[in-house]
């Protein structure tokens, strides 16, 4: 009898466990497990990645603005690219010519002799022995005066001052008190103007030398021959001309020189 009851209870318990749904089985097993058991059921974790609906627009890289190179200005015979004679070189030659022409006029006013005669007085070399050098000097001066040696680059004037600099505050210095600019050149004499005056001085030296070779007289004496005016009557004009050439030679004009390679000086 006791054995029959045990068998019946075992069959009933087994039948009950077989009819249970599989979802409930982990819970039954969990009831039989102790709380200190290290066995744990795996849990699912869902991770969410945030997505931006509006993304910032990527900025395009700024375009490089290439500065236009200064155009090479060829000389009359297209020699500017060959020997590299720039306007800065021509400006230097023009300054030397202005000093030389002013000194020759001053020397002729004092001694009454032209450039070649003054050179003979200083060196003692006869003119006929220096004829090749003299002809080369005349040719070089003429070619430089007409820009035949080349004129690479260009002169750029300084930018004009703004309206706020037009009114000069009082009490700065003497130039401000006279209504003149505090900084920069006193007069508006640019490097382009200085280049033009230098070319005129080169032409003056060249033609005065040619005239002295032909007539044997200096520049002032040639002027007397052409106009018939005595030198004594035009002394103030001669002195003014000499002073102007000296001042133009030593006065640094405003502006800057830009070559065809973009270099500034």
From Swiss-Prot:
InterPro entries: Chloroa_b-bind. The keyword Oxidoreductase does not apply. The chain crosses the membrane at residues 96-116, 130-150, 195-215, 229-249. It is a multi-pass membrane protein. Disruption phenotype: Normal green leaves under continuous-light conditions. Non-photochemical quenching (NPQ) phenotype. Accumulation of purple-colored anthocyanins leading to dark leaves after a prolonged exposure to fluctuating light. The double mutant missing DLDG1 and PsbS/NPQ4 (dldg1 npq4) has a pale-green phenotype similar to the dldlg1 simple mutant in continuous light, and an identically reduced NPQ induction as in the npq4 single mutant. One of its GO terms (molecular function) is chlorophyll binding. It is found in: Plastid, Chloroplast thylakoid membrane. Residues 1-59 form a transit peptide. GO terms for biological process: nonphotochemical quenching; photosynthesis; thylakoid membrane organization. It comes from the Eukaryota. SUPFAM superfamilies: Chlorophyll a-b binding protein. One of its GO terms (cellular component) is thylakoid. Its main location: plastid. Keywords: Chloroplast, Membrane, Photosynthesis, Photosystem II, Plastid, Repeat, Thylakoid, Transit peptide, Transmembrane, Transmembrane helix. Plays an important role in non-photochemical quenching (NPQ), a process maintains the balance between dissipation and utilization of light energy to minimize generation of oxidizing molecules, thereby protecting the plant against photo-oxidative damage; acts upstream of DLDG1. Is not necessary for efficient light harvesting and photosynthesis. Belongs to the ELIP/psbS family. This is Photosystem II 22 kDa protein, chloroplastic. It comes from Arabidopsis thaliana.
């Amino acid at each position: 009898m006791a054995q029959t009851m045990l068998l019946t209870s075992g069959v009933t318990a087994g039948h009950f466990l077989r009819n249970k749904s599989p979802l409930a089985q982990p819970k039954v097993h969990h009831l039989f497990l102790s709380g200190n058991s290290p066995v744990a059921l795996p849990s699912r974790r869902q991770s969410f990645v945030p997505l931006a609906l509006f993304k910032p627009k990527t900025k395009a890289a700024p375009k490089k603005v290439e500065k236009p190179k200064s155009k090479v200005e060829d000389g009359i015979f297209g020699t500017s690219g060959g020997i590299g004679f720039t306007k800065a070189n021509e400006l230097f030659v023009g300054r030397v010519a202005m000093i030389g022409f002013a000194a020759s006029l001053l020397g002729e006013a004092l001694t009454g002799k032209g450039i070649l005669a003054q050179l003979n007085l200083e060196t003692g070399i006869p003119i006929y022995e220096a004829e090749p050098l003299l002809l080369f000097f005349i040719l070089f001066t003429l070619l430089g005066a007409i820009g035949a040696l080349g004129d690479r680059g260009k002169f750029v004037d300084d930018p004009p001052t703004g309206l706020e600099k037009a009114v000069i505050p009082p009490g700065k210095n003497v130039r401000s008190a006279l209504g003149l600019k505090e900084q920069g050149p006193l007069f508006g004499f640019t490097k382009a103007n200085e280049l033009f005056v230098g070319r005129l001085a080169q032409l003056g030296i060249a033609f005065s030398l040619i005239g002295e070779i032909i007539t044997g007289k200096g520049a002032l004496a040639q002027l007397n021959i052409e106009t018939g005016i005595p030198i004594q009557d035009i002394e103030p004009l001669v002195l003014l001309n000499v002073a102007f050439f000296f001042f133009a030679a030593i006065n640094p004009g405003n502006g800057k020189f830009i070559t065809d390679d973009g270099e500034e000086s």
